[in-house]
């Protein structure tokens, strides 16, 4: 099990690497994370025993690394933030409104049996289960209701590796402090420390790892280098400094408004340094294209766009001929009207009245209680490309006479403005190339596939670990 001293310590990357490394040895491997809090979700594929169900993108990627079919048991609980103090609960791939309505501390006793059941079924079915923790196990206030860190480790009798992000500084204090906050029976499960995202000469770390082992009895089992390889992100922590897989051009970029309730932001990782997250009209200067991303609270984020002046600025760019792409919630914002007669979003449109969109596409969206979750593969008649992606939305959208429907219910166009419900478009390398050419941006000579990136990450992580000692923990 990989735990971290903090959020964004690199747990997801390390787990993906371990899944690929162990799969390379011929073992049947499954990833597992009891609970994710993220709006970066995907859906299980048709070959899954239960297709079309939601789970965290990190575990979807880890399943790919392990070369197994994704299964919602790998991420039994998914919390999708809707506001500062509320989250939608997705249990075993399906929205659970009865749990969403409960206070946080009352949910946990009801969730644990599902977590425990999913964990043990995977342990029975696979040779190895690579478990990812969440945040930090040292949050003393969360210990009584823990269902994702040390309670899972105890249940699985897992060997725990604790990772710290050394690039941020204070890694040895983080590791020692986390260890001190654990209960004695939890410390007994701690089998190694990992210094993650290191840049420079590892010999300069001496004698700190030896000192740390003297203090705790826990050895440092790896110094993993900074990995400049992009994987889909679990949450929004890394938005401020996205990993790059495409060189930054001297001029021009793709502007993406940093909506307060942005969802599925991981799908923009293929843009690398070409992506620039913006929060003001001034930051749009020089943009070659604009993408309006998905949102968990579309009407509220549309109001934010207007309050910041970005709505008007994006509209002006569209009128000037700059390519604009809206994805899911972004598609809905580009339309004429949004209505929420059932109060599905619980926000600005909850009264059932209409909210007016940017009017760049002649589309009208009504939110419905039933959620669409499915993988889709369609042919784009405009480009001739086969597009693969996934849908996760409550909106039902109808078109007016002023928009061209490219794929019914999925893809629309009006001049230089396009909208789609299909997440993951840019993860299709052929479409990414088309998009970059459309935006008059440079197309790199080679776009690495996800499997190639997973292989690269696994090789670098294995080189940084004392792999024989880690492997012996199984």
Curated annotation (Swiss-Prot):
Coiled coil: none annotated. InterPro entries: Class_I_gatase-like, CobQ/CobB/MinD/ParA_Nub-bd_dom, CobQ_GATase1, CobQ_N, CobQ_synth, GATase_3, P-loop_NTPase. Gene3D superfamilies: 3.40.50.880, P-loop containing nucleotide triphosphate hydrolases (3.40.50.300). Pathway: Cofactor biosynthesis; adenosylcobalamin biosynthesis. The keyword Phosphoprotein does not apply. Signal peptide: none annotated. SUPFAM superfamilies: Class I glutamine amidotransferase-like, P-loop containing nucleoside triphosphate hydrolases. NCBIfam families: cobQ, PRK00784.1. Catalyzes amidations at positions B, D, E, and G on adenosylcobyrinic A,C-diamide. NH(2) groups are provided by glutamine, and one molecule of ATP is hydrogenolyzed for each amidation. Belongs to the CobB/CobQ family. CobQ subfamily. This is Cobyric acid synthase. It comes from Deinococcus radiodurans (strain ATCC 13939 / DSM 20539 / JCM 16871 / CCUG 27074 / LMG 4051 / NBRC 15346 / NCIMB 9279 / VKM B-1422 / R1).
């Amino acid at each position: 099990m990989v735990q971290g001293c903090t959020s964004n310590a690199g747990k997801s990357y390390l787990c993906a690497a371990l899944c690929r490394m162990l799969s390379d040895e011929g073992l049947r491997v499954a990833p597992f994370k009891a609970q994710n809090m993220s709006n970066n979700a995907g859906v299980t594929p048709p070959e899954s025993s239960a297709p079309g169900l939601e789970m965290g993108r990190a575990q979807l990627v880890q399943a790919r690394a392990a070369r197994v079919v994704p299964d919602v048991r790998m991420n039994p609980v998914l919390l999708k933030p809707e506001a500062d103090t509320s989250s939608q609960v997705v249990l075993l791939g399906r929205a659970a409104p009865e749990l969403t309505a409960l206070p946080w501390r009352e949910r946990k006793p009801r969730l644990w049996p599902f977590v425990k059941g999913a964990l043990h079924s995977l342990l029975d079915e696979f040779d190895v289960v690579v478990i990812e923790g969440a945040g930090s196990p040292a949050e003393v206030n969360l210990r009584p209701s823990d269902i994702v860190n040390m309670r899972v480790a105890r249940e699985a009798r897992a060997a725990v590796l604790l990772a710290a992000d050394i690039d941020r500084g204070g890694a040895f204090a983080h590791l020692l402090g986390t260890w001190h906050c654990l209960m004695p029976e939890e410390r007994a499960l701690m089998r190694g420390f990992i210094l993650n995202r290191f840049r420079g000469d590892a010999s300069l770390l001496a004698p700190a790892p030896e000192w740390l082992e003297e203090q705790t009895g826990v050895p440092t089992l790896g110094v993993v280098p900074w990995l400049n390889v992009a994987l889909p992100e679990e949450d929004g922590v890394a938005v401020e400094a996205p990993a790059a897989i495409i060189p930054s051009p001297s001029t021009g970029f793709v502007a993406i408004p940093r909506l307060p309730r942005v969802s599925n932001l991981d799908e923009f990782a293929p843009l690398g340094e070409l992506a620039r997250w913006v929060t003001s009209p001034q930051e749009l200067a020089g943009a070659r294209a604009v993408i309006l991303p998905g949102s968990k609270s579309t009407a509220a984020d549309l109001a934010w766009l207007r309050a910041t002046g970005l709505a008007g600025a994006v509209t002006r760019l569209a009128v000037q001929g700059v390519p604009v792409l809206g994805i899911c919630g972004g598609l809905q914002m580009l339309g004429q009207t949004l209505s929420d007669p059932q109060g599905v979003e619980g926000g600005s449109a909850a009264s059932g009245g209409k909210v007016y969109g940017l009017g760049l596409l002649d589309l009208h969206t009504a939110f419905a209680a039933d959620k669409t979750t499915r993988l889709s593969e369609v042919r784009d008649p405009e480009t001739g490309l086969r597009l693969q992606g996934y849908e996760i939305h409550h909106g039902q959208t109808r078109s007016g006479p002023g928009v061209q429907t490219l794929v019914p219910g999925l893809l629309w166009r009006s001049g230089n403005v396009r909208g789609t419900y299909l997440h993951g478009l840019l993860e299709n390398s052929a479409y990414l190339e088309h998009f970059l050419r459309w935006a008059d941006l440079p197309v790199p000579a080679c776009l690495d596939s996800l499997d190639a990136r997973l292989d690269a990450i696994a090789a670098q992580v294995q080189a940084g670990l004392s792999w024989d000692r880690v492997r012996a923990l199984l």
